[in-house]
């Protein structure tokens, strides 16, 4: 489903306020805390044995920033999300072997983090637009999976 002009405006207006490093690190940290079995993808990140270690792990924070920056690319390519993420989908499928369900889980956590940090901006319509965006990004990232 494509985005209408109002949805594009809502997504863009909020995105310009987002602290990508902080929110990205928090989102990935939350995923690793809430879903500890996902830590297996990050075993080379050092100590991720508990919530405190995860929240203060520089590699987790840096990768969270990278992930959210990549998510932000979708904001710039709302009319071509699937094509934009084709190579990243291939990487996650063929090389990293990441369970595509993780994209949905992390997308939901990103929404929680954005809502917590930007409550005045994250109203019902903005939430709906971001939910649509998260679904499309997750589907694009899962596109190479069979």
From Swiss-Prot:
Domain annotation Globin: ranges: 2-146
Binding site for heme b: 63, 92
Tissue specificity of this protein: Red blood cells.
Sites bearing N-acetylalanine, chain numbering: 1
Pfam families: Globin
Record PROSITE patterns: GLOBIN
GO molecular function, one term: haptoglobin binding
Cellular compartments per GO CC: blood microparticle; haptoglobin-hemoglobin complex; hemoglobin complex
UniProt keyword annotations, A-Z: Acetylation, Heme, Iron, Metal-binding, Oxygen transport, Transport
GO terms, biological process: hydrogen peroxide catabolic process
Subunit structure: Heterotetramer of two alpha chains and two beta chains.
Family designation: Belongs to the globin family.
Protein name in UniProt: Hemoglobin subunit beta
Highest classification ranks of the organism: Eukaryota, Metazoa, Chordata, Craniata, Vertebrata
Name of the encoding gene: HBB
